[in-house]
Amino acid sequence: MLPMRYKSILLAFLLFYVSLAAFAAPGTMRLDYYHTGDASHELFSVDRIVIEPLPWPGDLTKTIDDTNLGNYFFEVRDQANGRVLYSRGFSSVYGEWITTEEAKTASRTFSESLRFPVPEAPVKIVLKRRDEGEFREIWTTRIDPKDKFIDSSRPHSPGPLLTIQKSGEPATKVDLLIMGDGYTAAERTKFENDARHFTEILFTRSPFRERRADFNVWGLCPPSEESGISRPSNGIHRRSPLGTTYDTFDTERYILTPENRALRDYASYAPYEFIEILVNGATYGGGGIFNLYATVTADS
């Protein structure tokens, strides 16, 4: 039998580890859905619900977005009492496409995603759109975290995670993920150098320069079969892992990707809040969507 003092020490250790478990970060849930419509109408449908490989990277004391930014806004509400557990404002590729001439005469479908901490009980997802300065509800769906059809399988790995700058634990820092597209396996070193170069340039500019210690910067680069990305105006088409392309919305230097599903699966192997897609190419181009991602060419 253990002496009383050893029992006390053992009990203290047990309580310590139980307290750690209680404050452990929850998993990361992602709702992938389809956004369909034209300049006048839009509708939504669930694609899949997944549990990403890594724990939730965000600050659990700052789950409510009160900035009133973005063209869309979503809330995760406790289904039992309606309490808002998580919210974020964002914009989307669809939201930009509906301003084009094509949207006046045709419909298109875009893949989109909402990420949030895995809830402990059933929740209601409420999606809102900005209308005359106010967010108005346009779609709802319900999620039971115990649903057997929630996909917890691990997607195809993009390769090793590159730590470019680690200033602290993800929950206490802003996590920026730099993703390479159009880099072959043989160009992995080039991606690493390009990502580090981009990081140094970013932190020479205000307000990033003054807040550098508040950031973690990570890198992922799924290998591409061919070097470079698509540029349809020059007759160049590539099947790059992230699907980035010039000529988005028939604007020659505008680079976005329609492949949201692939982007999110690859990105799930890093803790992130913001994504910068670094395109392997020398022709000037880039773009960005609020709270979605930004793109830039590495060598321009």
Regions found by a protein language model. Give the residues of each.
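Aromatic sugar-binding surface patches on proteins
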Residues: 93-113
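Edge beta-strands of extracellular beta-sandwich domains
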Residues: 132-148
